[in-house]
């Protein structure tokens, strides 16, 4: 092989080897940034926080879920906040790193604010915040807080190469965690059950909407006392278990 051809081949090999590593480093590096924090009322003891996905700041499905939750959660000491984390959510390659960083900040911010029950709901890339919020809150809060998590078709790709991180870790910090998944949509990293949550697979239920948003609509349509109860537990609904085509009637 002539020297120019050999050099060209070595260059191609170097690019092929280094490109994934460069992308991995890029996706996991997160500069420190400041963002507005959720501001629950001083009287709030039960808080529901919603986290949208990448590019989902004004997602109609999440807006409808927020409205429905407000209608059902009427106690004076309860509050629903849809947290907008755009623009940090908007790049899918960096959403995992940014979500973990921001979640830690939110948890620390919420510590010692009189909150006793926290329900964290994340759609798509919004799934990256709940466990970080929970871990940070438990670290800094002086009193116990009961935490429930709901993951709606969560994206679990961490960085550029780790496709299984979310399916293995999402929900681990919660007292109770559930996931509603659609396994045949075309969004990478959303098709596996979560090992640390109770899973409801809605793939085979008929619908005429975007497959990645379908779990959000399903959850909204089936909200009832059990969906919102802070007493749900993994003795009755084990972590890692999958229930297919379960439809709960709405109140």
Positions of PLM-derived features:
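Short, Lys/Arg-rich N-terminal segment immediately upstream of the first membrane anchor
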Residues: 1-6
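Hydrophobic membrane-insertion alpha-helices, especially the h-region
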Residues: 7-24
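Alpha/beta-hydrolase-fold serine-hydrolase catalytic core, especially in secreted/extracellular enzymes
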Residues: 214-216, 221-251
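A conserved mid-domain beta-alpha-beta active-site/ligand-binding segment of alpha/beta enzyme cores
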Residues: 198-224
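Ser/Thr/Pro/Gly-rich low-complexity linker/stalk segments immediately outside membranes or between
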Residues: 25-45
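Short beta-strand element of the alpha/beta-hydrolase
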Residues: 45-53
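Serine-hydrolase catalytic-loop signature spanning alpha/beta hydrolases and amidase-signature enzymes
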Residues: 55-57
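Serine-dependent carboxylesterase/thioesterase catalytic core
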Residues: 45-46, 59-60, 64-68, 78-85, ...
């Amino acid at each position: 092989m002539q020297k120019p051809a050999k050099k060209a081949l070595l260059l191609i090999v170097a690019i092929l080897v280094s490109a994934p590593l460069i992308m991995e480093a890029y996706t996991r590096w997160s500069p420190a940034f400041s963002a507005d924090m959720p501001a629950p009322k001083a009287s709030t003891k039960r808080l529901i926080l919603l986290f949208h996905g990448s590019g989902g700041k004004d997602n109609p499905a999440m807006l409808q879920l927020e409205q429905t939750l407000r209608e059902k959660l009427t106690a004076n000491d309860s509050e629903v906040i849809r947290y907008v984390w755009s623009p940090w959510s908007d790049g899918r390659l960096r959403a995992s790193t940014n979500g973990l960083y921001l979640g830690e900040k939110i948890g620390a911010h919420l510590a010692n604010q009189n909150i006793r029950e926290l329900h964290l709901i994340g759609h798509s890339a919004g799934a990256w915040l709940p466990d970080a919020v929970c871990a940070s809150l438990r670290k800094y809060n002086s009193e116990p807080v009961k935490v429930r998590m709901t993951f709606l078709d969560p994206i679990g790709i961490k960085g550029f190469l780790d496709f299984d991180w979310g399916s293995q870790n999402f929900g681990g910090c919660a007292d109770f965690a559930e996931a509603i998944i659609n396994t045949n949509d075309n969004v990478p990293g959303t098709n596996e059950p979560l090992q640390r949550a109770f899973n409801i697979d809605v793939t085979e239920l008929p619908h005429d909407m975007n497959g990645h948003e379908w779990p959000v609509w399903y959850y909204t349509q089936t909200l009832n006392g059990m969906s919102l109860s802070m007493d749900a537990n993994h003795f009755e609904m084990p972590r890692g278990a999958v229930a297919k085509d379960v439809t709960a009637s709405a109140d």
